[in-house]
Amino acid sequence: DRKFMLKDFDKFMSQLKETNQTLDFFCDFDKISQNVEDIKLSLCMLNSLIGASDLRKSVETIWNRDKNAFSVMDILVAVRTRDKKKILDSVGNCVPLESMFTSVDSVMTFLTETGLGEVLQSQKVKNLVDYVFGIETGLDTNARKNRSGHVMENTVANILTNAGISFRQEVYSREWS
């Protein structure tokens, strides 16, 4: 009966809280700190680019010492390596972003075309470790959305379970087409 269903739905809706967020919900600082710690040595090497009067020479110095330091540069533009991002190169070819870290020339192209070289040379950033901590905090907002969704899923699941109502945790749209 439709009237009975509406009454139950209204009761269900009245039991939901305005929010499901506690203070520990906003940022997972343990995860953020670990992500930064994992690349800290490379970031410290890249710190020498900050304020460099001859950016290319500074890049060459790092390259000759440890070219792997550049493999973390994607995070400086808020991209994670595991996302396997692709970009269009200067001639329109679709290439992996990580290919920008395979030579001094490609690193220079990355620094120039992203604007990051100017940011570093003009010292708009003072320390890449702190800068990446901020980026990681920003990237954690997507994880926050996922955390919020999971908390709400569990809240609704508990309400339905306690009411003895059978349900499926997830239903995919392809099942309805």
Model segments located where?
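A short, surface-exposed helix-loop junction/capping segment
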Residues: V129-R144
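N-terminal, charge-rich interaction modules
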Residues: T141-T155
